[in-house]
């Protein structure tokens, strides 16, 4: 069984914001794999299905970003999901819009949703797909930037990145994460 989590904030006012690119990637996987995110439990919206013979759970924590670990840990405990069967997808200010970086482990890098996940799991040793949103320009505050929407021009790159992240997740069902990293970190 595999768990794929996308980080974001709940509520219509946060839809399509930079901070919600993880939710957008989960929505793409749900559509692609015909998985309904219709279960509300573990402080999140989730759904499960079979993809290439592998049971997959997709989760969007509904705790707000800074408390994401409160949703992820109980679900992992309930379904007895090992760290190697878990991927988290989230926005990254240090990557250009549309770029992905897959990592096997690492610090939170200033991301509060990842910080919460590390705190609740008790380790940094989990796989992740960092999705670039770039840094704010013209002195804009980071909080205003990440809670702002992508421009129409950026959405072209964002949609490509979401598709690429979904492809990486799909490949991960049949390959090791290290192999997927080698294929997608180029």
Curated annotation (Swiss-Prot):
Site (Discriminates between blocked and unblocked aminoacyl-tRNA): 9
Site entry: Stabilizes the basic form of H active site to accept a proton: 91
Catalysed reactions, as listed in the record: an N-acyl-L-alpha-aminoacyl-tRNA + H2O = an N-acyl-L-amino acid + a tRNA + H(+)
PROSITE patterns assigned to the protein according to its UniProt record, in alphabetical order: PEPT_TRNA_HYDROL_1 (PS01195), PEPT_TRNA_HYDROL_2 (PS01196)
Pfam families tied to this protein: Pept_tRNA_hydro (PF01195)
Cross-referenced CDD domains: PTH
Coiled-coil residues: none
Function as written in the Swiss-Prot or TrEMBL entry: Hydrolyzes ribosome-free peptidyl-tRNAs (with 1 or more amino acids incorporated), which drop off the ribosome during protein synthesis, or as a result of ribosome stalling.
Protein name stated in the entry: Peptidyl-tRNA hydrolase
Species whose genome carries this gene: Bacillus cytotoxicus (strain DSM 22905 / CIP 110041 / 391-98 / NVH 391-98)
